[in-house]
């Protein structure tokens, strides 16, 4: 066995406590911003395949055409992002045994491969159960839902996911859902939604109560698998992942967790809808192309976002900070984005629309940082317009410089405030420094932070296959 030693810097963890799962959610948050979504990829498929194994690994390119590569994931890190959110479907086409919620081994292997790409690039990963054909995010909140049966399916599913990924270090986070109460029903749905998505009444309170029942099942299932999962940071979702509804209705302290300070909250941001997502004019309003102060002089007022919308976003984020971050629950903005459009000459100028889009990404990122919220830009790999596509995956390049520059303008403006909320954590609290161990036996890890061998006094006395390992803070190459 030939051993080659080198300082482990390029792909090393930011903090040795990550390997020992010793960081709190707030300490981990220091390293995570900004984030990016591998959208329309691992969550793709058809819900006619729910609870079957008909999706296959080819589902990765069902909604966009590029297979994810190590080179591309490395480029995400080189471009300044520190985290990747991986939306994943498990039930929608990747279940081999419905009774036990067993996941197709080939699918698990492919998801692991992409997680490994991220670990090798020292990116933090948020791995979730996305809309997933609506099996729970819609069907679990209907008037006819068998809640007990859904809970048992959820417990089995997250037990299987957690066991498959339990050896990864603290750079891997689990998120129980995506947007609970949002999205389409599956073919198996019974009844209608139990609440009015646009109303606020007792039925909405009942919805939040049921949501937290499911979230408790998620937390308990992951913790029960033990190992690194006993202290892994977990992410729970606010109702509809909506700012206002989460601020008003979601009491995160109702969730219990055997691990102290290891919970984060998730919300999403596509507001205002008329600027970010509306595709065509309606009788109640028109698509907004420009932001106030960034519109051409000849633009119709009906095409310009009132600046009060910006103030409302900032206010809502600060309320989230008060209600959650200041109480020890960091927040991820799991998705945020606005459509970058092609503007007809009759509607104004393209340059002013581009400027407005950049401005939106800039202040959204900045305000998130100032509220202790970790933002993850949504990206679908749709290279046409309108889109929310930051990168061209096949070309391994930036697709939309306007959006990219807006994100990092906000990163620059908000970084000082963010670091004040989440200061750099100690590297020694809870662990001994490697150099203090002298000749004492220590552990060997692979580059993804997974334990390979423990109580190793000398590498000469342990059998390692060819590969790259971490031992006493150094990279070890076995050839």
Residues of each region from the PLM?
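N-terminal carbohydrate-binding accessory modules
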Residues: 12-83
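An active-site-proximal structural segment forming one wall of the substrate-binding cleft
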Residues: 17-18, 63-84, 94, 98-131, ...
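Acidic/histidine-rich helix-loop elements
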Residues: 38-68, 96-103, 146, 274-310, ...
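Surface-exposed, active-site-proximal loop segments in enzymatic domains
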Residues: 47-58, 90-109, 133-150, 182-201, ...
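Catalytic domains of carbohydrate-active enzymes, especially glycoside hydrolases
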Residues: 67-89, 319-324, 365-367, 374
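Active-site region of glycoside hydrolase catalytic domains
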Residues: 148-307, 318-338, 370-371
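Aromatic-rich peripheral "rim/lid" segments of glycoside hydrolase catalytic domains that contact
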Residues: 343-433
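C-terminal outer-membrane/trafficking sorting elements
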Residues: 431-479
């Amino acid at each position: 066995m030939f051993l080659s030693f080198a300082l482990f810097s390029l792909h090393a963890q930011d903090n040795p406590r990550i390997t020992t799962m010793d960081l709190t959610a707030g300490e981990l948050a220091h390293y995570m911003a900004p984030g990016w979504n591998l959208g329309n990829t691992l969550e793709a498929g058809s819900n006619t395949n729910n609870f079957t194994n008909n999706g296959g690994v080819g589902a990765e390119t069902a909604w966009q055409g590029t297979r994810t590569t190590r080179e591309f994931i490395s480029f995400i890190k080189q471009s300044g992002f520190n985290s990747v959110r991986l939306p994943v479907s498990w039930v929608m086409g990747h279940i081999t045994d419905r009774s036990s919620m067993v996941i197709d081994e080939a699918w698990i292997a492919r998801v692991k491969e992409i997680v490994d790409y991220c670990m090798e690039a020292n990116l933090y990963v948020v791995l979730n159960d996305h809309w997933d054909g609506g099996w729970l995010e819609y069907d679990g909140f209907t008037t006819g839902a068998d809640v007990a049966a859904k809970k048992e399916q959820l417990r089995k599913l997250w037990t299987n996911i957690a066991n498959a990924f339990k050896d990864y270090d603290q750079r891997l986070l689990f998120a129980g859902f995506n947007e609970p109460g949002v999205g389409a029903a599956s073919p198996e749905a019974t009844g209608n939604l139990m609440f009015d998505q646009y109303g606020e009444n007792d039925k909405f309170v009942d919805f939040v109560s049921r949501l937290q029942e499911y979230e408790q099942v998620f937390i308990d299932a992951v913790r029960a698998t033990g190992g690194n999962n006993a202290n892994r940071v977990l992410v729970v979702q606010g109702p509809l992942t909506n700012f206002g509804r989460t601020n008003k209705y979601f009491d995160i302290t109702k969730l219990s967790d055997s691990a102290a300070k290891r919970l984060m909250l998730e919300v999403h941001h596509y507001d205002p809808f008329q600027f970010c997502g509306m595709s065509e004019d309606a009788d109640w309003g028109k698509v907004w192309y420009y932001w106030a102060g960034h519109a051409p002089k000849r633009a119709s007022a009906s095409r310009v976002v009132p600046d009060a919308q910006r103030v409302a976003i900032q206010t809502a984020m600060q309320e989230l900070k008060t209600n959650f971050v200041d109480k020890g629950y960091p927040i991820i903005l799991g998705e945020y984005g606005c459509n970058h459009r092609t503007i007809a000459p009759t509607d104004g100028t393209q340059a002013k629309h581009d400027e407005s889009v950049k401005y939106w990404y800039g202040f959204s990122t900045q305000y998130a940082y100032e509220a202790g919220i970790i933002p993850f830009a949504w990206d679908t790999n749709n290279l046409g317009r309108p889109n929310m596509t930051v990168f061209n995956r096949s070309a391994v390049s930036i697709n939309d410089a306007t959006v990219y520059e807006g994100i990092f303008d906000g990163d620059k403006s908000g970084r000082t405030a963010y670091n004040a909320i989440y200061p750099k954590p100690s590297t020694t609290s809870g662990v001994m420094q490697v150099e203090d161990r002298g000749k004492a036996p220590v552990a060997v890890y692979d580059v993804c932070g997974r334990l390979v061998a423990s109580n190793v006094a000398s590498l000469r006395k342990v059998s390692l296959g060819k590969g790259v390992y971490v031992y006493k803070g150094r990279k070890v190459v076995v050839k």
